[in-house]
Amino acid sequence: MKTVLAIFSSLNGTEGNSSKLANEYLLKIENDDSVRINRVDVASLALPHLTGEEMQAWMTDASERNESQHALAKISDNIVEAVKAADEIVLAVPMYNFGIPSSLKAYFDRIARAGITFKYTETGPVGLLENKSATVFAARGGVYAGSDFDTQTPYLKHFLNFIGISDVNFVYAEGLNMGEEQANSAFADANEKIIELTKG
């Protein structure tokens, strides 16, 4: 059984363009009896920004945590458990002010745990989440891929690589606010990429 963790982050929910792209991909694989899909909408989760108190809860031995620390550590523990259980991570990512949504960053902050999802060595950090892949569906109002304005792609690649996920595919739909013709063309190109990714 292949487990897919689909992470959505659009403020527009299922109507968001990144959500539509990711759902098109999931639609093509969900009828396979060997695939199980778990969905999470980080925009609706409304995770708070990471605090020193929460990080301290992680670093406190479980046997020594107080009630508040147990509750704080559980937030990250549940997220990490879902990521560890997945064979593929699907990310639906809109571009907000040239970056990823803050809700997604808050989610990522609960994934990066020293000794759990990565470790430090004499030669640098090593990711611990091996044998996983990620597929990113990036929707943008303008055209930014390959330019300095695209901070998403390098950040997402670096973060995923950092925790051990090096098999990463990107599907872009750009220029969605630059007229109907451009938007239709962008979606058509993205759908072709989706078909390629779901073949066989």
Curated annotation (Swiss-Prot):
It catalyses: 2 a quinone + NADH + H(+) = 2 a 1,4-benzosemiquinone + NAD(+); N,N-dimethyl-1,4-phenylenediamine + anthranilate + 2 NAD(+) = 2-(4-dimethylaminophenyl)diazenylbenzoate + 2 NADH + 2 H(+). Keywords: Flavoprotein, FMN, NAD, Oxidoreductase. The keyword Oxidoreductase applies. It comes from the Bacteria. The keyword Flavoprotein applies. FMN binds at residues 10, 95-98. Its cofactor is FMN. It holds the Pfam family Flavodoxin_2. Binds 1 FMN per subunit. InterPro entries: Flavodoxin_fold, Flavoprotein-like_sf, FMN-dep_NADH:Q_OxRdtase_AzoR1, NADH:quinone_OxRdtase_FMN_depd. Its EC number is 1.6.5.-, 1.7.1.17. Gene3D superfamilies: 3.40.50.360. GO terms for molecular function: electron transfer activity; FMN binding; oxidoreductase activity, acting on NAD(P)H as acceptor; oxidoreductase activity, acting on NAD(P)H, quinone or similar compound as acceptor. Quinone reductase that provides resistance to thiol-specific stress caused by electrophilic quinones. Also exhibits azoreductase activity. Catalyzes the reductive cleavage of the azo bond in aromatic azo compounds to the corresponding amines. Homodimer. Belongs to the azoreductase type 1 family. PANTHER family: FMN-DEPENDENT NADH-AZOREDUCTASE 1 (PTHR43741), FMN-DEPENDENT NADH:QUINONE OXIDOREDUCTASE (PTHR43741:SF2). This is FMN-dependent NADH:quinone oxidoreductase. The gene is azoR.
